[in-house]
A protein has these predicted regions:
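Residue in the alpha/beta-hydrolase core beta-strand immediately N-terminal to the catalytic nucleophile
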Residues: 41-44, 63-65
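The alpha/beta-hydrolase serine catalytic core
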Residues: 63-65, 69-182
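Active-site catalytic motif of lipid deacylating hydrolases and related acyltransferases
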Residues: 1-37, 157
């Protein structure tokens, strides 16, 4: 997804694609540090990244595009306790991740407060993009309880390069144009 976004915006926008820590509190701190340093126009995340982006967007006052947001990470993680590998190659070459109870507890803590900063003002500043064939995350109804703009694309949970270029990139560009004076 990161490479496809970089290609889609080549010459028009800088796309930052950090390898985030597994633990969500550390990941939020890292994203916040990047935001403070780089001043991006938009946050964009998929799945767990969308979970993090929607929590941080109103705090840092930046619009966000959430791709297939997974708002109940604890449910997902409880079924996957143990050692796994990241789907995409990481810059540090560490492909190993371990899901354990402390990680699940940290996500549970954040899940309980994830919508606390969602204000009426932000209902139009956070957009959701949902794959019609997503077999993992089905959170469009929950999204619409908090936000107004939901879009659908004919894909699954993890978008292909073509889906990123056809759906994610155009919506991100539209958001950046809409909120450019923000």
């Amino acid at each position: 997804m990161a490479l496809a976004l970089k290609e889609a915006f080549e010459g028009t926008a800088v796309v930052l694609t950090p390898d985030l820590p597994l633990h969500p509190k550390e990941a939020l701190k890292e994203i916040r540090s990047i935001v403070d340093r780089e001043h991006p126009d938009l946050l964009l995340g998929n799945s767990c990244g969308a979970f993090l982006a929607q929590m941080l967007a109103p705090v840092v006052d930046i619009p966000a595009l959430l791709g297939n947001p997974y708002f109940k990470m604890t449910e997902f993680l409880k079924e996957r306790i143990g050692e796994h590998e990241y789907k995409a190659p990481r810059r540090d070459s560490n492909q190993r991740l371990v899901i354990e109870e402390t990680l699940i507890e940290e996500f549970a803590e954040l899940e309980s407060i994830q919508f606390d900063n969602c204000t009426p003002y932000y209902k139009d500043m956070v957009w959701g993009l949902f794959g019609e064939h997503d077999a993992i995350a089905h959170f469009c109804p929950l999204f619409l309880e908090h936000y107004n703009n939901a879009f659908h694309f004919p894909g699954g949970h993890t978008p292909t390069e073509q889906e990123v270029k056809a759906w994610y990139a155009p919506l991100a560009a539209k958001m950046m144009m809409k909120f450019e004076d923000f």
